Regions:
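Short, Lys/Arg-enriched N-terminal segments with co-localized hydrophobic residues
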Residues: 1-17
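Membrane-interface capping segments at transmembrane-helix boundaries
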Residues: 76-81, 247-260
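Juxtamembrane helix-entry segments on the extracytoplasmic side of multipass membrane proteins
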Residues: 115-127, 174-188, 228-229
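Alpha-helical transmembrane segments in multi-pass membrane proteins
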Residues: 22-74, 124-125, 129, 233-240
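Membrane-interface helix/loop boundary segments of multi-pass membrane proteins
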Residues: 136-162, 201-205
Length: 260
């Protein structure tokens, strides 16, 4: 797919210089993403914002990041296919089992029901918010970070992007999540990152990644919180499904790239 791999070699950068360039781009990408994620959480905390207003403010900050990033790449490349904004590879949906495991995991958040007490505005606001998160995280972790490391090896691209994806969820501490809950979420996020990275590499398109990522967060945000026991059981089930799916996806890679 045109533009899928960052063309560092095409502009005369090779060897150690190319690796340093990748590290530099990765650091800058993480810094920009974390800056905006920190900002959206800090604004809410410093202003004691709650409810619908806080969701919309956080969504606005992240959408600003998404729009700014898209504008930057359009001006630089006049094409967003370099970020994976293109049609998925033919038959890639079949190779990733039509994303069914990820859809099942997302819907499983509704085991205790959907929080409808806060009204349609709450659900709509969370849709806007989670869509922003889906775009931002997939653009940066898959479209930028995973993409620039993939020409070295699939394994390195998956591990680097997934590790940073998991670390990024430390920001949830700023959002009020407990330490134990955040640690568990980081472990889950690492495995989830591996799966989404493999989906991205197999399909060479970011659209499906954004869709399933948004669906997962949206279902989680509007679901009713269960008991601790229920959450543990659900977490274990989701983890097992993800692990099996990751193994399955690794076998769908081209033979010369099965190093994950």
């Amino acid at each position: 797919m045109r533009g899928f791999i960052f063309p560092l070699r095409q502009i005369g950068i090779g060897g150690s210089k190319m690796k340093k360039s990748k590290v530099f781009i990765t650091v800058i990408a993480m810094a920009v993403l974390l800056l905006f994620f920190f900002a959206q959480g800090a604004i809410v905390m410093m202003t004691n914002m709650e409810g619908l207003k806080s969701i919309l403010v956080r969504a606005t900050v992240i959408w600003l990041l998404v729009i700014a990033t898209i504008v930057f790449y359009l001006k630089r490349n006049r094409d967003l296919s370099i970020l994976g904004f293109c049609k998925p590879m033919e038959k890639s949906s079949k190779r990733v089992f039509f994303y069914i495991p990820l859809i099942v995991i997302a819907i499983s958040h509704f085991m205790c029901g959907i929080d409808t007490n806060k009204g349609a505005s709450f659900i709509f606001a969370n849709l806007i918010f989670t869509l922003a998160i889906g775009f931002a995280e997939e653009i940066y972790f898959r479209g930028i970070i995973c993409r620039i490391w993939i020409d070295e090896s699939v394994k390195k691209a998956v591990v680097v992007s997934s590790t940073l994806f998991a670390i990024c969820h430390l920001m949830n501490v700023m959002g009020g999540a407990g330490i134990a809950e955040t640690i568990l979420q980081i472990c889950f996020a690492f495995l989830y990152g591996i799966v989404i990275s493999l989906v991205f590499i197999i399909g060479k398109s970011i659209w499906s990644c954004i869709a399933v990522h948004t669906l997962h967060d949206f279902c989680s945000f509007i679901s009713i919180d269960g008991s601790l026991q229920m959450n543990v059981i659900l977490g274990v089930i989701q983890f097992v499904i993800l692990l099996c799916y990751a193994i399955y996806l690794s076998k769908q890679l081209p033979y010369d790239n099965q190093d994950v």
